[in-house]
Amino acid sequence: MQAAMNVMFWNVGRRARAARRAGALGLLVLLAGLLGTAALAAETLVVGPEGTPLSLTAALSQAQDGDTIELLPGEYRDAHAVLENRRLTIRGIGKRPLISGGGKPSGTHKALWLVRGGEVVLENLEFRGARAADGEGAGVRQEGGRLVVRRCDFFDNEYGVHALNDDRAELTIQDSVLGMAPKVVGGLHHLLNVGRIARLSVSGSRFQQGFEGHLIKSRARESLIRYNFIHDGQRGGASYEIELPAGGLATVIGNVIGQGADSQNRVMLAYGTDGRPWDRNTLLVAHNTFISYKWTPAWFMRVFSDGLPADTEVVAVNNLLVGPGLFWLGAPGYFDGNRPAVRGMLRDADTYAFELAPGSVWHGSGIDPRQVGRRDLSPQAEFEWPVGTRALEAGRTTWSPGAYQR
């Protein structure tokens, strides 16, 4: 009797295990089918400057979630576009296609391209000549969603990229160039103008040739500005190189930040100018090379404490300060390893070789940035000309001030 029961239970267990295996196999087949269907559903639409194979308007009207639109080389004149609530990648193929506004007002959307929600990636495109009747014409204007801009150029636009207030929006800019602000007296045209969004990340990018406006202006709750060349040129006429008027959680690491002799403002990095900060406010500034071409003293970094909460935290370590000026005077916080220098102490400032010259007394003079309180502020990369980054070797035990460890 016991033997019979053992056989019965063994058979039941074997059938149960087989059923489970069959169920799992069926689930895997179903998932594979769904993934295959999704992969097959994603399409690549090709656009040409003369409208063949498709025009940009036609491609945008046909595109579905997950699709890619590829632009052939050439100039796309008056190719205004609205991208709404989709997952979409638009990339240039080969030589960077030019999206041209021709220096004329761009209509109701005040941008060459308007990104309205969704998850959008723009790659290998150039936006030039955006204008609007109110002076706020943008190459790309973001109204919500997540936008990634990668390997794109923005020249001669009233705003290169303009992100409007939306506390859930995110903007990422990688390996791009923003420059040549229109020379309009009183225009205040910023190369990058970011409203009160959730997060801004900028890396491996170059900002140059501003005029009266700022190179970077961000009111984001979190601003990560790392490994960029934010340098207006020796005769540049921008105002602030970086302005963070609403405070927030700001990380500024590994950048070259240069202010031209014709700048209308001697402050290079400004934090908290609005008096309307976020609920959490921390400024981390590490391993930047600040360069002032003015004869009068610069104010390399200014924290507007009067408009910030009492618990605002400021940490600045291992920055290289080239030229006459002030850095931490009057600013609350922790400062260490920041070193003054003149251009002659650099390898070759005239050719933008801003690393310390061989034999400099400042080589290896920085503090260990991996142990600043409970934070690791060590740079993981360096800006690599003309755009992009170069990873630093792991295992470093000595640190030099500034954006370069060469």
Question: What is each model feature region?
Answer:
Residues 24-36:
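Bacterial N-terminal signal peptides
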Residues 44, 48-54, 68-70, 86-135, ...:
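Right-handed parallel beta-helix/beta-spiral solenoid domain characteristic of secreted/periplasmic
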Residues 359-406:
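Surface beta-loop-beta hairpin patches that serve as ligand-binding interfaces in beta-rich domains
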Residues 74-76, 94-96, 366-370:
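Acidic glycine-/aspartate-rich tracts in secreted/extracellular proteins
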Residues 1-20:
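N-terminal secretory signal peptides that target proteins for export/translocation
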Residues 80-81, 98-115, 127-355, 359-360, ...:
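Glycine- and acidic/polar-rich repeat regions and solenoidal domains
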Residues 37-41:
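Sec/Tat signal peptide C-region and signal peptidase I cleavage site
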Residues 43-72, 76-78, 360-363:
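Acidic Gly/Asp/Thr-rich repetitive segments characteristic of extracellular carbohydrate-active
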